[in-house]
């Protein structure tokens, strides 16, 4: 177990070292917990979170039966894209945080693209 955690931490550092959000193209960071999914749009040059969404957001909290499914990830992706477009953000850099680009991560990214964000 310890070795797999070390490998994951290495992947996180490797991916994060290559990705940096700017004012023009902020970073869309995704975290996948055991029970919930979180997404943030971050401007690294100023150190400011521009928008955030999760399965714990008031807009989604009562509407989802189970919070860790692909459908929940799609809902979070649509919500984060909606909030970003309201703030004037159209282009982002996708930070998958070492997770494989399948399942929930892919569903969140695809829905965010369909809702108006460009990666």
From Swiss-Prot:
Family matches, as InterPro entries: Ribosomal_uL18_bac-type, Ribosomal_uL18_bac/euk
GO biological process: one example: translation
Keywords: Ribonucleoprotein, Ribosomal protein, RNA-binding, rRNA-binding
Pfam families per record: Ribosomal_L18p
GO-annotated cellular components: cytosolic large ribosomal subunit
A GO MF term: 5S rRNA binding
Subunit architecture: Part of the 50S ribosomal subunit; part of the 5S rRNA/L5/L18/L25 subcomplex. Contacts the 5S and 23S rRNAs.
Similarity field: Belongs to the universal ribosomal protein uL18 family.
Functional summary from the UniProt entry: This is one of the proteins that bind and probably mediate the attachment of the 5S RNA into the large ribosomal subunit, where it forms part of the central protuberance.
Record-given protein name: Large ribosomal subunit protein uL18
Originating gene: rplR
